[in-house]
Amino acid sequence: MDRGEQGLLRTDTVPEEAEDAAATISATETLSEEEQEELRRELAKVEEEIQTLSQVLAAREKHLAEIKRKLGINSLQELKQNIAKGWQDVTATSAYKKTSETLSQAGQKASAAFSSVGSVITKKLEDVKNSPTFKSFEEKVENLKSKVGGTKPAGGDFGEVLNSTANASATSGEPVPEQTQEGL
Protein backbone atom coordinates (compact mmCIF):
# COMPACT_ATOMS: atom_id res chain seq x y z
CA MET A 1 0.00 0.00 0.00
CA ASP A 2 1.23 3.47 -0.76
CA ARG A 3 0.99 6.43 1.61
CA GLY A 4 -2.26 7.83 0.02
CA GLU A 5 -4.11 4.55 0.50
CA GLN A 6 -2.92 4.30 4.11
CA GLY A 7 -4.55 7.66 4.93
CA LEU A 8 -7.90 6.37 3.66
CA LEU A 9 -7.73 3.24 5.81
CA ARG A 10 -6.85 4.95 9.09
CA THR A 11 -8.43 3.44 12.21
CA ASP A 12 -8.22 6.62 14.31
CA THR A 13 -11.35 7.62 16.20
CA VAL A 14 -13.53 10.48 15.04
CA PRO A 15 -12.72 13.65 16.97
CA GLU A 16 -15.20 14.59 19.71
CA GLU A 17 -17.06 17.91 19.74
CA ALA A 18 -14.79 20.93 20.08
CA GLU A 19 -11.77 18.77 19.31
CA ASP A 20 -9.54 19.94 16.50
CA ALA A 21 -9.16 17.18 13.89
CA ALA A 22 -5.80 18.52 12.69
CA ALA A 23 -4.42 18.46 16.24
CA THR A 24 -5.58 14.85 16.67
CA ILE A 25 -3.86 13.68 13.49
CA SER A 26 -0.63 15.45 14.33
CA ALA A 27 -0.72 14.13 17.92
CA THR A 28 -1.07 10.52 16.79
CA GLU A 29 1.84 10.94 14.43
CA THR A 30 4.06 12.08 17.33
CA LEU A 31 3.03 9.18 19.61
CA SER A 32 4.91 5.96 19.48
CA GLU A 33 3.16 2.68 18.73
CA GLU A 34 3.45 1.73 22.39
CA GLU A 35 1.83 5.00 23.57
CA GLN A 36 -0.95 4.63 21.02
CA GLU A 37 -1.60 1.07 22.18
CA GLU A 38 -1.68 2.24 25.83
CA LEU A 39 -4.22 4.96 24.93
CA ARG A 40 -6.36 2.44 23.02
CA ARG A 41 -6.44 0.16 26.09
CA GLU A 42 -7.40 3.12 28.29
CA LEU A 43 -10.08 4.13 25.77
CA ALA A 44 -11.51 0.60 25.80
CA LYS A 45 -11.46 0.59 29.61
CA VAL A 46 -13.27 3.95 29.83
CA GLU A 47 -15.86 2.83 27.26
CA GLU A 48 -16.41 -0.36 29.27
CA GLU A 49 -16.84 1.66 32.49
CA ILE A 50 -19.35 3.92 30.74
CA GLN A 51 -21.29 0.85 29.57
CA THR A 52 -21.23 -0.60 33.10
CA LEU A 53 -22.42 2.70 34.58
CA SER A 54 -25.23 2.85 32.01
CA GLN A 55 -26.32 -0.66 33.01
CA VAL A 56 -26.16 0.24 36.71
CA LEU A 57 -28.19 3.39 36.05
CA ALA A 58 -30.81 1.38 34.13
CA ALA A 59 -31.02 -1.13 37.00
CA ARG A 60 -31.38 1.70 39.56
CA GLU A 61 -34.13 3.34 37.48
CA LYS A 62 -35.94 -0.01 37.27
CA HIS A 63 -35.63 -0.40 41.05
CA LEU A 64 -36.94 3.15 41.53
CA ALA A 65 -39.96 2.39 39.33
CA GLU A 66 -40.64 -0.79 41.33
CA ILE A 67 -40.52 1.10 44.64
CA LYS A 68 -42.88 3.77 43.30
CA ARG A 69 -45.25 1.07 42.06
CA LYS A 70 -45.29 -0.57 45.50
CA LEU A 71 -45.96 2.79 47.16
CA GLY A 72 -48.77 3.50 44.71
CA ILE A 73 -47.04 6.49 43.21
CA ASN A 74 -47.87 6.83 39.54
CA SER A 75 -46.95 9.38 36.92
CA LEU A 76 -50.13 11.39 37.42
CA GLN A 77 -49.57 11.63 41.16
CA GLU A 78 -45.97 12.66 40.57
CA LEU A 79 -47.13 15.33 38.15
CA LYS A 80 -49.66 16.61 40.71
CA GLN A 81 -46.98 16.68 43.40
CA ASN A 82 -44.56 18.49 41.09
CA ILE A 83 -47.18 21.07 40.18
CA ALA A 84 -48.14 21.58 43.83
CA LYS A 85 -44.48 21.95 44.79
CA GLY A 86 -43.88 24.35 41.90
CA TRP A 87 -46.91 26.45 42.89
CA GLN A 88 -45.72 26.49 46.49
CA ASP A 89 -42.30 27.66 45.32
CA VAL A 90 -43.88 30.40 43.19
CA THR A 91 -46.13 31.65 45.99
CA ALA A 92 -43.15 31.83 48.32
CA THR A 93 -41.30 34.32 46.10
CA SER A 94 -41.24 37.98 47.03
CA ALA A 95 -42.34 38.96 43.52
CA TYR A 96 -45.51 36.88 43.88
CA LYS A 97 -46.23 38.31 47.32
CA LYS A 98 -45.81 41.88 46.08
CA THR A 99 -47.97 41.23 43.02
CA SER A 100 -50.65 39.54 45.12
CA GLU A 101 -50.70 42.42 47.59
CA THR A 102 -50.91 45.00 44.79
CA LEU A 103 -53.76 43.13 43.07
CA SER A 104 -55.60 42.80 46.38
CA GLN A 105 -55.37 46.55 46.96
CA ALA A 106 -56.49 47.24 43.40
CA GLY A 107 -59.47 44.92 43.87
CA GLN A 108 -60.47 46.68 47.06
CA LYS A 109 -60.25 50.07 45.36
CA ALA A 110 -62.26 48.82 42.36
CA SER A 111 -64.91 47.38 44.68
CA ALA A 112 -65.17 50.69 46.53
CA ALA A 113 -65.42 52.55 43.22
CA PHE A 114 -68.21 50.27 41.94
CA SER A 115 -70.07 50.66 45.22
CA SER A 116 -69.75 54.42 44.95
CA VAL A 117 -70.98 54.40 41.35
CA GLY A 118 -73.95 52.22 42.36
CA SER A 119 -74.86 54.64 45.14
CA VAL A 120 -74.65 57.60 42.78
CA ILE A 121 -76.85 55.87 40.19
CA THR A 122 -79.43 54.93 42.83
CA LYS A 123 -79.55 58.52 44.11
CA LYS A 124 -79.92 59.89 40.58
CA LEU A 125 -82.79 57.48 39.83
CA GLU A 126 -84.53 58.53 43.05
CA ASP A 127 -84.06 62.18 42.08
CA VAL A 128 -85.58 61.50 38.65
CA LYS A 129 -88.51 59.60 40.21
CA ASN A 130 -89.19 62.49 42.59
CA SER A 131 -88.87 65.16 39.90
CA PRO A 132 -91.98 67.13 38.82
CA THR A 133 -91.50 66.03 35.21
CA PHE A 134 -91.58 62.33 36.11
CA LYS A 135 -94.59 62.84 38.43
CA SER A 136 -96.45 64.61 35.63
CA PHE A 137 -95.59 61.79 33.20
CA GLU A 138 -96.67 59.17 35.77
CA GLU A 139 -100.04 60.93 36.23
CA LYS A 140 -100.60 61.05 32.48
CA VAL A 141 -99.89 57.32 32.16
CA GLU A 142 -102.30 56.54 35.02
CA ASN A 143 -105.02 58.70 33.42
CA LEU A 144 -104.52 56.98 30.08
CA LYS A 145 -104.64 53.57 31.76
CA SER A 146 -107.91 54.39 33.52
CA LYS A 147 -109.47 55.68 30.29
CA VAL A 148 -108.42 52.62 28.28
CA GLY A 149 -108.98 50.01 30.96
CA GLY A 150 -112.06 51.53 32.53
CA THR A 151 -112.91 50.52 36.08
CA LYS A 152 -111.96 46.87 35.72
CA PRO A 153 -110.14 45.54 38.74
CA ALA A 154 -106.46 45.00 38.21
CA GLY A 155 -105.09 41.48 38.37
CA GLY A 156 -106.97 38.21 38.34
CA ASP A 157 -105.94 35.02 36.69
CA PHE A 158 -106.95 33.69 33.29
CA GLY A 159 -109.68 31.47 34.74
CA GLU A 160 -111.40 34.40 36.45
CA VAL A 161 -111.31 36.46 33.27
CA LEU A 162 -112.72 33.54 31.27
CA ASN A 163 -115.53 32.98 33.78
CA SER A 164 -116.45 36.65 33.88
CA THR A 165 -116.57 36.74 30.07
CA ALA A 166 -118.79 33.64 30.00
CA ASN A 167 -121.11 35.10 32.62
CA ALA A 168 -121.36 38.38 30.73
CA SER A 169 -122.24 36.51 27.54
CA ALA A 170 -124.84 34.33 29.26
CA THR A 171 -126.64 37.30 30.83
CA SER A 172 -126.73 39.20 27.57
CA GLY A 173 -128.52 36.32 25.85
CA GLU A 174 -125.87 35.81 23.22
CA PRO A 175 -124.68 32.24 22.69
CA VAL A 176 -121.18 31.35 23.83
CA PRO A 177 -118.89 30.90 20.81
CA GLU A 178 -118.53 27.16 21.57
CA GLN A 179 -122.29 26.67 21.33
CA THR A 180 -122.35 28.40 17.96
CA GLN A 181 -119.71 26.09 16.58
CA GLU A 182 -121.52 22.98 17.86
CA GLY A 183 -124.71 24.04 16.14
CA LEU A 184 -122.99 24.04 12.73
From Swiss-Prot:
Q: Biased composition, Polar residues: where in the chain? A: 162-184
Keyword terms, alphabetized: Coiled coil, Phosphoprotein
| Coiled coil regions in record | 22-74
GO:BP terms for this protein? B cell differentiation
User: Residue ranges of region Disordered?
Assistant: 1-43, 147-184
**Which modifications occur after translation, per UniProt?**
Phosphorylated in a calcium/calmodulin-dependent manner.
A GO molecular-function annotation: calcium ion binding
Record's GO cellular component terms: cytoplasm; endoplasmic reticulum; perinuclear region of cytoplasm
Q: Give the sites modified to Phosphoserine.
A: 136
Query: Where does the sequence pass through the membrane?
Result: none
**Membership in a protein family:** Belongs to the TPD52 family.
Please describe the quaternary structure of this protein.
Answer: Forms a homodimer or heterodimer with other members of the family.
The name of this protein is: Tumor protein D52
Source organism: Oryctolagus cuniculus (Rabbit)
Question: Lineage of the source organism?
Answer: Eukaryota, Metazoa, Chordata, Craniata, Vertebrata
* Gene giving rise to this polypeptide: TPD52
